[in-house]
């Protein structure tokens, strides 16, 4: 029985756990290695008054699953952020962490990677088969088509009622969820993508994939990373007292930073390091 989305695409989501909090991310395979991509606020607490960013904690774990749908044990990477440098975009809500360098390919086309200092795992010793978004699956901002179908990958942790026993929860919060929507529009001034798809707490940093129908074949492309939802703001004014009560709700639309912005950022950071 065929699946609507390829197995390797379903293994892209990464659960990020840091300082008692969690968010979403994904691995992106650049030319020199694999990078963890997420939203900046997943890893950093923002001090708006002083315009400062502070890491929620000095250690973080990245959990993901292999492309084998029968594999139930996640691949867990532990990152010491005192040894691993986190790069943050100067404009967008984006953070990247280089986790490994590519050593060689297996006969099946999988990269055998070697972790950089500060990244460890208990599962497979020093080598790890990563499942990241390849460069040839990344769609440029200029090529993104409004109205096309999209999928949001992530770990929304604000859904459901969190019970003390995992068995009592409706959701398994250690497994990713998909959400289907469309590309609602593009903001050319900000160079961002607007999606018609609800974004919840925990989805931040998650990957968005576009599905394109070519003849009778479905093709999937990485669009970018979820950074926030667009609020619906309603002001209610008292006619008697003149007071205003503001209600802010989730509009069902979200903002995505395109993947080519992330690739440009990675390239600039590489050039600055040489």
Predicted regions and their residues:
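C-terminal cap/linker of serine protease catalytic domains
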Residues: 2, 219-274
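Catalytic histidine site
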Residues: 4-78, 96, 100-102, 182-186, ...
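Short, charged beta-turn/beta-strand-edge "cap" motif at the junction between a beta-strand
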Residues: 43, 156-159, 214-215, 230
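Hydrophobic alpha-helical segments and helix pairs
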Residues: 77-132
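Short glycine/Trp-rich loop-beta-loop segment that forms part of the substrate-binding cleft
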Residues: 119-168
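A mid-sequence, solvent-exposed acidic-amphipathic segment
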Residues: 156-202
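Catalytic nucleophile loop of clan PA
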Residues: 197-226
């Amino acid at each position: 029985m065929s699946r609507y989305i390829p197995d390797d695409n379903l293994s892209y989501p990464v659960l990020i756990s840091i300082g008692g909090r969690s968010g979403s991310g994904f691995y992106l395979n650049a030319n020199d290695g694999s990078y963890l991509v997420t939203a900046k606020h997943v890893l950093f607490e923002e001090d708006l008054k002083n315009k400062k960013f502070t890491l929620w904690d000095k250690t973080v774990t990245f959990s993901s699953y292999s492309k084998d749908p029968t594999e139930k044990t996640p691949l867990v990477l532990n990152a010491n952020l005192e040894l691993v440098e986190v790069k943050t975009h100067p404009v967008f809500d984006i953070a990247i962490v280089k986790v490994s360098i590519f050593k060689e390919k297996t006969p099946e086309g999988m990269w055998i990677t070697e972790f950089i200092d500060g990244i460890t795992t208990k599962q497979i010793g020093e080598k790890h088969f990563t499942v990241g978004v390849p460069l040839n699956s990344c769609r440029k901002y200029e090529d993104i088509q409004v109205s096309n179908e999209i999928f949001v990958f992530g770990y929304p942790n604000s859904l459901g009622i969190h019970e003390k026993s995992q068995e009592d929860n409706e959701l398994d919060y250690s497994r990713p969820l998909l959400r289907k929507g469309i590309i609602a529009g593009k903001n050319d001034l900000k160079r961002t993508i607007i999606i018609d798809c609800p974004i919840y707490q925990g989805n931040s940093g998650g990957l968005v994939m576009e599905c394109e129908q070519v003849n009778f074949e479905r093709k999937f492309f990485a669009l970018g990373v979820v950074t926030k939802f667009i609020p619906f703001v309603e002001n209610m004014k008292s006619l008697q007292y003149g007071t205003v009560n503001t209600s802010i709700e989730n509009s069902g639309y979200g903002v995505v930073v395109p993947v080519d912005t992330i690739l440009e950022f990675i390239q600039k950071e590489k050039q600055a390091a040489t």
